[in-house]
Design a protein with these regions (language model features):
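Binding/recognition "hotspot" determinant
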Residues: 50-53, 58, 62, 66-69
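N-terminal acidic, proline/glycine-rich, low-complexity intrinsically disordered segments
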Residues: 1-9
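Structured, contiguous alpha/beta core segments that scaffold functional sites
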Residues: 2, 13-17, 21, 25-31, ...
Length: 194
């Protein structure tokens, strides 16, 4: 009697769905570049989740102190172009705290996006009506300077479609890291193991 050949049951090889390559490929397929910040990658965090560090009293106090220093720094316009300079000085004086605070958000998170809403004055001039910081997860900075809005399966180049509507501020961006360098990612492991 012939011996039955035993078929060796083996598991199929994994396609590596949990590897960085798979995650990067999925992100590329979806159109969003994977964040290459090493700390965020190792911790499994998104940039928005760095906000948990702001709950720490020491970190929050240090960030607030630095923001206050920036807000209280003197500013001036170098060139004088007459009526336009006067108009811009009035505008910047009115919106100084909102503009500087919104741009400063790039320090802890690497980048920030502000949306400006305009109004028409009685003497037919466009002026700022509102300027607000928008959520990081809605936008993707590109290494060529473009800003992409991603929401509800849509992708819009906001600089092309809405010029002077959205303002991107980045901290130390590079070609490889267009999202900028977030300060809070450097504190993450120190905070986590405290």
């Amino acid at each position: 009697m012939a011996k039955k050949s035993e078929s060796k049951k083996t598991k199929p090889k994994s396609a590596g769905l949990m590897t960085e390559v798979a995650v990067e490929n999925l992100a590329f397929t979806l159109g969003r570049k994977a964040d290459i910040d090493e700390v965020l990658r190792q911790a499994g965090l998104t940039r928005q989740r760095l906000s948990v560090l702001m709950v720490d009293d020491e970190i929050a106090q240090a960030m607030e102190t630095r923001l206050d220093a920036v807000l209280n720094a003197p500013w001036r316009f170098i060139e004088d172009h007459g009526e336009q300079t006067v108009f811009l000085k009035e505008l910047f004086t009115r919106w100084h705290a909102e503009i500087v605070s919104g741009a400063w958000e790039a320090c802890p998170y690497g980048y920030s996006v502000m949306e400006a809403n305009y109004a028409l004055t009685s003497d037919s001039k466009f002026t700022l009506n509102e300027i607000v910081v928008k959520p990081l997860e809605w936008f993707e900075p590109k290494n060529d300077g473009r800003l992409i809005y991603r929401q509800n399966a849509t992708e819009v180049d906001v600089n092309a479609k809405y010029p002077l509507k959205f303002f991107l501020t980045r901290r130390k961006p590079t070609f490889k890291q267009p999202y900028g360098d977030p300060l809070l990612s450097k504190l993450y492991w120190l905070w986590f193991f405290r």
